[in-house]
Design a protein with these regions (language model features):
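Non-catalytic beta/alpha edge segments that cap or flank active sites
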Residues: 1-171
């Protein structure tokens, strides 16, 4: 789900959403259904979309891009926190640590991750290069997280993303 005022109005070509879709197509070998949304930087719109994707569409993982900086309209983390039952602070911490190896301004990022029911929701940076740098690393934990929440087993292409699972959880 891309969060961007300009992209949602068609004033700017969304590059973040396609970068995430590219990763999915390269890394995930299991059959999957992808639902794409491009919405404005608005807390209520973001919350509504997240709730719809999890509660109505049954998404086990919802990945957002955009709206995580310090600008007044960057409200994706607040919307994510509002709809999640439990937060997963390691996601935001790890994404900032990864990005700090590339740019000092990564400290300005406010990405979060959390659980809504048995679904994982997390925010990625907005730029395709930063998306790839972070998703390559954090996705290593996502399939096992989905396993633990009772979701479908995600088979990964180990050459693209060597996801970690304890021996007892491997198929």
């Amino acid at each position: 789900m891309t969060v961007s005022d300009r992209a949602s109005k068609g004033e700017y070509t969304d590059e973040g959403g396609p970068a995430i879709l590219k990763f999915f197509s390269e890394a995930i070998k299991s059959p999957l259904t992808v639902i794409y949304r491009c919405i404005p930087d608005d807390v209520e719109a973001i919350q509504s979309a997240l709730i719809e994707l999890v509660d109505e569409q049954g998404c086990h993982v919802v990945v957002t891009t955009g709206g995580t900086g310090p600008a007044a309209r960057d409200v994706t983390p607040e919307a994510t926190e509002a709809v999640c039952d439990r937060m997963m602070p390691g996601f935001g911490e790890q994404m900032r640590a990864i990005s700090l190896a590339y740019v000092p301004t990564a400290i300005l990022s406010r990405q979060v991750g959390g659980l809504r029911g048995s679904s994982l929701v997390f925010n990625l940076p907005g730029r395709p290069k930063s998306i790839r740098e972070t998703i390559d690393e954090i996705w290593k934990a996502v399939p096992y997280c989905v396993d633990l929440m009772g979701g479908p087993y995600m088979d990964m292409d180990a050459e693209v993303c060597d996801a970690f699972r304890p021996v007892s959880a491997r198929r």
